[in-house]
Amino acid sequence: MRFMIQFSIPTQYGNEIVRSGKVEKIFKKLGEDLKPEAMYFYPADGLRSGSIFIQSNDPGLCVAVGERLWFGLHAQVKITPVMNGDDLGKGLSELGKAIENYS
């Protein structure tokens, strides 16, 4: 399954890790650990924020990813299952059966 992990770093802590040089180390380690399809960084609501896209079948994903971001960045974290076009197509192909069985 594919997931989008969104995070926002509190301003004060973000300033601290940028000044100390830790931010580069943390993001490099996240990339090594999570092996994401993509990582994007941007300002959102006045905070340093980002989105990480990963594939995982691990039921412990929320804990594993959340703890890295909470401990490493003091971040607010949101984890959302997402689909690409192929995933959506597979789901839609099953839609007829679901409608037939549950309507």
Identify the role of each PLM range.
Residues 1-103:
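Conserved, structured core segments of small domains
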